[in-house]
């Protein structure tokens, strides 16, 4: 275990992944985060676990959105970075999940697992987390067994926020002070912010 950004991170484990159990701070609201939360919260409140795929091109804020949703739920969150992973949850990952019993699990860059993704999900079914969130840059490149109906409860595409959100956050005076070019740049910022 090592400390990183005030969290304990399980590193140098046989799976080769950074497994980070932590409690996330409250997240700012955004229209898309509010929409997704409105879809999953009634189930979580009723005690029914939910599984969510967040899909979108790189840089749209899927990872931030995943943290936002997990923070809204509260409780213990397990962040797993799958960047370049091949052996996630074969042995040590499942042991960590069973030991920590997180309320939410976030699997970042899930599409990087390739053919190992189905095995990973099968292992996660044994973990009784209330919320499973996976992020992917290319849903269509994933094994059809992953995206078949019934495997995940919800699929959301993450995109940019748009001008209305930033007018609310920045205030109309500040927004109007931006040049048209800068307004266009800000409008393209990820939806998770």
Residue ranges and their predicted role:
Residues 109-149, 154:
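Conserved catalytic/switch belt of AAA+ P-loop NTPases
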Residues 160-167, 173-193:
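Conserved AAA+ ATPase small/helical "lid" subdomain
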Residues 37, 73-101, 114:
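Short glycine-rich substrate-engagement loop in P-loop NTPases that contacts/grips substrate
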Residues 54:
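Hydrophobic anchor at the beta1->P-loop junction of P-loop NTPases
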Residues 1-49, 57-58, 65, 69, ...:
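AAA+ P-loop ATPase mechanoenzymes
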Residues 84-86, 111-112, 138-141, 160-166, ...:
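Conserved nucleotide-binding/hydrolysis micro-motifs of P-loop NTPases
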Residues 44-47, 71-73, 95-101, 121-129, ...:
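Conserved catalytic network of the ASCE P-loop NTPase/AAA+ motor domain
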Residues 105-106:
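Walker B beta-strand of ABC/ABC-like P-loop ATPase nucleotide-binding domains
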């Amino acid at each position: 275990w090592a400390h990183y950004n005030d969290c304990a991170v399980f590193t140098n484990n046989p799976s080769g992944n950074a497994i980070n159990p932590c409690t996330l701070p409250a997240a700012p609201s955004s229209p898309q985060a509010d929409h997704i939360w409105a879809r999953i919260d009634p189930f979580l409140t009723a005690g029914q676990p939910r599984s969510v795929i967040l899909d979108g091109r790189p840089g749209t804020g899927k990872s931030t959105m995943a943290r936002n949703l997990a923070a809204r739920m509260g409780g213990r969150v397990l962040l797993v970075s799958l960047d370049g992973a091949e052996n996630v949850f074969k042995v040590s990952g499942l042991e960590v999940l069973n030991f920590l019993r997180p309320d939410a699990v976030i699997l970042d860059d899930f599409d990087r697992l390739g053919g190992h993704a189905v095995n990973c999900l099968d292992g996660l079914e044994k973990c009784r987390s209330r919320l499973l969130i996976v992020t992917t840059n290319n849903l269509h490149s994933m094994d059809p067994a992953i995206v078949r109906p019934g495997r995940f409860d919800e699929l959301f595409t993450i995109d940019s926020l748009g001008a209305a959100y930033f007018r609310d956050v920045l205030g109309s005076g500040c927004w109007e002070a931006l040049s048209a070019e800068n307004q266009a740049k800000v409008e393209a910022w990820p939806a998770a912010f």
